[in-house]
Amino acid sequence: MRRVERVEFSGLWDPEPGWLNTASYGLPPRPAWEALQAALSEWRVGAMSWEPWDESTTRSRESFARLVGADAADVFVGSTVSAALAPIATALPDGAKVLTDDVEFTSNVFPWKVHEDRGVEVVGVPGEELVAAIRPGIDLVAVSAVQSSTGVVLDLPAVIAASKEIGALVVIDGSQAVGWLPLTVDGIDALVVHTYKWLMSPRGATLGYLSPRLQELCRPSAAGWYAGADVHTSYYGTRMDLAPGARKFDQSPSWFCYVGAAPALELIEQIGVETIQQHNLALANEFRDGLGLPPSNSAIVSTSLAGAQEAFASAGIRAAVRDGKLRASFHLYTTPADVHQALAALKPLQ
């Protein structure tokens, strides 16, 4: 696999060497950083109105829709994954059964579990057993496209096919996937993504897709002025005229977050997700090879090598520890030098 040379993206990032932690927090590209600084400068002196900032929300919605093959009318905006999933969980009938991975990130678990008092049951199984566990009696499958702790990439077509066969809803957390892994909403009922990881945006911007089927099933229980058909006439009073489509599920956006998100998402479109995937996997697999691991289809590498966390810390390499294992992640601003530095730090442990 050809490595996409970083010179192709030169000038877009200014990372200090050794950042291997995009799975925790992505680094902003220069256009996103500059847009955010400009908005902050306007705010500081009062030289602004919120409407231009809100144009970034529309741009983010439209860019996300293009990235995942959705209609922008089926995309909603918010701030967190768990809040975005709450209306779906509320719409589940009493006694519904939800299937998930037993190491699923809790933002895609707790929204379902808080309904256990009305009989909703959440069942977790090992990831390799997930597809086989999709059988009659399961009402909804809630799982990540890429697992946060391990980097395992979901067999999404198999999950969709098995769920369709029994009529189960498919709800995907794409926070560790969208931005580097080609993914569309075909066959998915809901896709929710926080943008501060692989979409390299400020924390506080979440984008989601709701299928027309789910839009009919769910109630916009967090509706506010921003969910109005005309936000300017939705400020006051008891009259409610909600927006059509998924926009009725919009939560009032944190504008600064979307000011940074819009140029970051548009840059990903410009570079191309397939190109990003190629770049990320080349570096991740170079790292895996140095550890004596076989190649993988993930930009996240997890290793249980004893002492790895301490070795990284001593070498100034920033990564994460998840479920007792070192987790390294590789994105557009990662360089071959970062990989070599990481392998050199771990070599005495092998």
Question: Residue spans of the language-model regions?
Answer:
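Pyridoxal 5′-phosphate
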Residues: 1-350
